[in-house]
Curated annotation (Swiss-Prot):
Entry similarity comment: Belongs to the complex I subunit 2 family.
Organism: Shigella sonnei (strain Ss046)
Official protein name in the record: NADH-quinone oxidoreductase subunit N
Enzymatic reactions: a quinone + NADH + 5 H(+)(in) = a quinol + NAD(+) + 4 H(+)(out)
GO-annotated molecular function: NADH dehydrogenase (ubiquinone) activity; NADH:ubiquinone reductase (non-electrogenic) activity; quinone binding
UniProt keyword Ion transport, yes or no: no
Range of residues in the leader sequence: none
Enzyme nomenclature, EC number: 7.1.1.-
NCBIfam families according to UniProt: NDH_I_N, PRK05777.1-1
Recorded GO CC terms: plasma membrane
Xref: Pfam families: Proton_antipo_M
Role of this protein: NDH-1 shuttles electrons from NADH, via FMN and iron-sulfur (Fe-S) centers, to quinones in the respiratory chain. The immediate electron acceptor for the enzyme in this species is believed to be ubiquinone. Couples the redox reaction to proton translocation (for every two electrons transferred, four hydrogen ions are translocated across the cytoplasmic membrane), and thus conserves the redox energy in a proton gradient.
Keyword Repeat attributed: no
Segments traversing the membrane: 8-28, 35-55, 71-91, 105-125, 127-147, 159-179, 203-223, 235-255, 271-291, 297-317, 326-346, 373-393, 408-430, 455-475
Length: 485
């Protein structure tokens, strides 16, 4: 096929991030300069974000059989770029205290962002697999970046081995789907999967294996066992990327697959997904109740959040409100997670060995860093789904689509999960205002609010509050992003 100027405009975010990868790589080869390479990475990601405006002007189109650029792709590309940008800004002060090679960190984040953008645009099982591998491979290095710490190295090895196993399940599942349907394109799959075909054993086995592979990447029960250990062992800025960009990109492509290939029409697949959603919500919240490590706590809570999103995915056949629910919920989850992990990153910067991830490190934070404590409180309230925060709007949407689709037992799970989630989120928030220990173990820099990471954290808190009270701008953006079927 011929690549036209319109196609190149549609691929601008991908091309800009790819070019930034090359520029940063050459810059590292020429001369190691931490500030220069961090700045180049941030400029490249910002340029990719700005280019989305030009992509919108070009309109929806299929760019090669592997990719479709439309409003849906633009929304998820934007969310991935925001998460990558935040990761780079949190990493800069953290790396200032790191004595080994700093610059490769940005290179790995940029390559992972490239994978996320590819996933947001994927319209074919081949591009889905390529995107997942492109986002996973750099994460093996990022998770073990603090390799002199046993916990970080252990997390990296665990994530690498389990991720490779999950990828093999995903690939084998795709092979079985191809054997039955004769095509790997999402649109062709939708056309080829007739009424009777969804009950074919080979096809069900293929989709089942794909659910195992994708369930691992999304930390869904029972494929979640790596999540708390990897979140705890990875450096705080890397945990930010894992919790946000990685999950958002993969969930976005899964939703597009469900939109085009009506897998939800199969009763067997719906039942399996409903059981996974129920188990993720209940187990994620129950395990988070006993955690005293903030990164582990947020790891378990991310399992429950993906369970809530799965409820909206199961209800996808009932209408466009489910797509709206997923978009709003993911935006709320992104800003809340960026704020929470951002505070952990600021408290852990510059690098001084293990991160400040113990709940005790945050005890009495309000008395010497009041604004930082207020930001953390807002994030905990949003993740808990308290009214007047963006997290509440997202959770309300999920409940609404669950009721609309008559998924009563899953609605019950969302209510019970949210109620139990209140306990551990409020426990973190309350500890910020307790009597401070005489000698605090870790603390954020005194001028944290003037750093790039501090500004990102403050903007995230502001967006969570403003969009929680007035969500219409976000809802309008999500509605514009409905894929043009």
């Amino acid at each position: 096929m011929t690549i036209t100027p319109q196609n190149l405009i549609a691929l601008l975010p991908l091309l800009i991030v790819g070019l930034t990868v090359v520029v940063v790589m050459l810059s590292i080869a020429w001369r190691r300069n931490h500030f220069l390479n961090a700045t180049l990475s941030v400029i490249g990601l910002n340029a990719a974000l700005v280019s989305l405006w030009f992509v919108g002007q070009a309109g929806a189109m299929d760019v090669t059989p592997l990719m479709r650029v439309d409003g849906f792709a633009m929304l998820y590309t934007g969310l991935v770029l925001l998460a990558s940008l935040a990761t780079c800004t949190f990493a800069y002060p953290w790396l200032e205290g790191y004595n080994d090679n700093k610059d490769e960190f940005y290179l790995l984040v940029l390559i992972a962002a490239l994978g996320g953008i590819l996933l947001a645009n994927a319209n074919h099982l081949a591009s889905l697999f390529l995107g997942i591998e492109l986002i996973s491979l750099p994460l093996f290095g990022l998770v073990g970046y603090a390799f002199r710490q046993k916990r970080s190295l252990e997390a990296s090895i665990k994530y690498t081995i389990l991720s490779a196993a999950a990828s093999s399940f995903l690939l084998f599942g795709m092979a079985l789907v191809y054997a039955q349907s004769g095509d790997l394109s999402f649109v062709a799959l939708g056309k080829n999967l007739g009424d009777g075909m969804l009950n074919e054993p080979l096809l069900l086995a293929g989709f089942g294996l794909m659910i195992v592979g994708l369930g691992f990447k999304l930390s869904l029960v029972p494929f979640h066992l790596w999540t708390p250990d990897v979140y705890q062992g990875a450096p705080a800025p890397v945990s930010t990327f894992l919790a946000t960009a990685s999950k958002i990109a993969i969930f976005g492509v899964v939703m597009r697959l469900f939109l085009y290939a009506p897998m939800g029409d199969s009763e067997a697949i719906r039942v399996v997904l409903a059981i996974i959603a129920f188990a993720s919500i209940i187990f994620g919240n129950l395990m988070a109740l006993s955690q005293t490590n903030i990164k582990r706590l947020l790891g378990y809570s991310s399992i429950s959040h993906l369970g809530y999103l799965l409820v909206a995915l199961i209800a996808l056949q009932t209408g466009e409100m489910s797509m709206e629910a997923v978009g709003v919920y993911l935006a709320g989850y992104l800003f809340s997670s960026l704020g929470a992990f951002g505070v952990v990153s600021l408290m852990s910067s510059p690098y001084r060995g293990p991160d400040a991830d113990s709940l005790y490190s945050y005890r009495g934070l309000f008395w010497h860093r009041p604004i930082l404590a207020a930001v953390m409180t807002v994030m905990m309230l949003s993740l808990a789904g308290i009214p007047m925060t963006l997290g509440f709007i997202g959770k309300f949407y999920v409940l609404a689509v669950g009721v609309q689709a008559h998924l009563w037992w899953l609605v019950g799970a969302v209510v019970v999960g949210s109620a139990s989630g209140l306990y551990y989120y409020l426990r973190v928030a309350v500890s910020l205002y307790l009597h401070a220990p005489e000698q605090p173990g870790r603390d954020a820099p005194s001028n944290w609010q003037y750093s790039a990471g501090g500004i990102v954290v403050l903007i995230s808190a502001l967006l969570v509050l403003v969009l929680g009270v007035w969500p219409q701008p976000l809802i309008s953006i999500v509605r514009l992003a409905m894929p043009l079927m």
